[in-house]
């Protein structure tokens, strides 16, 4: 019995280690990231000229018990001619780990010409981590006798340049490296939050009066992890309906869909089909987005909006 308990603890430790490294190496990134760009670049905050609320839901590794799930709620908008503010709440869950990120964004924009804007942004906040070791149901073992709760502050920064047709983004999150532990005194497993760098760009081509082609690329670099890249292309019809495809190198192929239901509300859906070794153990990922404009465009707001933002202003 003692030997079986040791083996069980080792297996649980391996699972915890995997989950911790999933968290430590991954900052929430949606396939339709441009719907909630301020999550990865605070310089985007306020760029719509009015306040925008966004809710995202992502279920990863569908069909696999304990697979990653993410829910996001964000709000950002202008508070002056050049200043934007934002707030985001992101909840991540995988296996017995649950983490909630709460961050505030600040941006300052400069009109470099009549049709171009350069914005700088800062992000500050922290993450609340809970490891539900008691939920494992292991009795009479001090190693799993209490849950783990941690708070880790962190910062981010970014630069965002855009015209009516083009954008380029450079940003970083997790500037402070923090360690995660699955046990206070007796460490079961640990991982680190590493600094994440994002580089992204996109362009809008006018195919006809009603159709536009929107290619984009997003690259993500994390210390001690392979470079990740999303290559996407979509077609926008009449500023109301958008559909396209995306490829995350060596990981997934995705189908994208968005529809504008009113002048100020649109919804989106994405299905990611896994092409890595995990494809035999899950049914891909589902992602839903809900975007709502609040109020009217401010009088002193810039006439230029980011090219991938196609809600009526």
Q: Where would I find each of the regions flagged by the language model?
A:
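Bacterial Sec-dependent N-terminal signal peptides
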Residues: 1-27, 233, 312-313
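Subset of outer-membrane beta-barrel
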Residues: 25-313
């Amino acid at each position: 019995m003692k030997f079986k308990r040791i083996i069980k603890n080792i297996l649980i430790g391996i699972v915890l280690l995997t989950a911790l490294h999933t968290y430590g190496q991954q900052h929430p990134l949606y396939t339709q990231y441009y719907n909630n760009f301020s999550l990865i670049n605070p310089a985007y905050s306020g760029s719509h000229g009015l306040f925008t609320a966004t809710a995202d839901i992502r279920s990863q590794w569908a069909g696999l018990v304990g697979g990653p799930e993410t829910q996001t709620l964000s709000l950002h908008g202008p508070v002056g001619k050049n200043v934007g503010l934002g707030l985001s709440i992101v909840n991540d869950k995988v296996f017995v780990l649950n983490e909630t990120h709460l961050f505030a964004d600040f941006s300052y924009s400069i009109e470099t010409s009549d049709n171009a804007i350069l914005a700088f942004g800062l992000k500050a906040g922290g993450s609340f981590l809970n490891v539900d070791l008691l939920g494992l149901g292991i009795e009479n073992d001090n190693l799993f006798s209490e849950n783990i709760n941690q708070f880790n502050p962190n910062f981010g920064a970014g630069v965002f340049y855009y015209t009516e047709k083009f954008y380029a983004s450079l940003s970083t999150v997790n500037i402070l490296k923090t360690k995660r532990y699955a046990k206070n005194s007796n460490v079961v497993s640990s991982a680190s939050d590493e600094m994440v760098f994002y580089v992204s760009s996109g362009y809008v081509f006018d195919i006809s009066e009603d159709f536009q082609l929107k290619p984009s690329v997003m690259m993500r670099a994390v210390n001690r992890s392979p470079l990740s890249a999303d290559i996407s292309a979509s077609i926008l019809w009449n500023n109301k309906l958008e559909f396209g495809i995306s490829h995350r190198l060596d990981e997934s192929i995705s189908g994208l869909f968005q529809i504008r239901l009113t002048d100020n509300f649109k919804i989106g859906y994405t299905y990611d089909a896994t092409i890595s070794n995990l494809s035999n153990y899950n049914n891909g990922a589902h992602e839903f987005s809900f975007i709502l404009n609040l109020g009217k465009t401010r009088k002193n707001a810039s006439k230029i909006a980011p090219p991938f933002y196609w809600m009526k202003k």
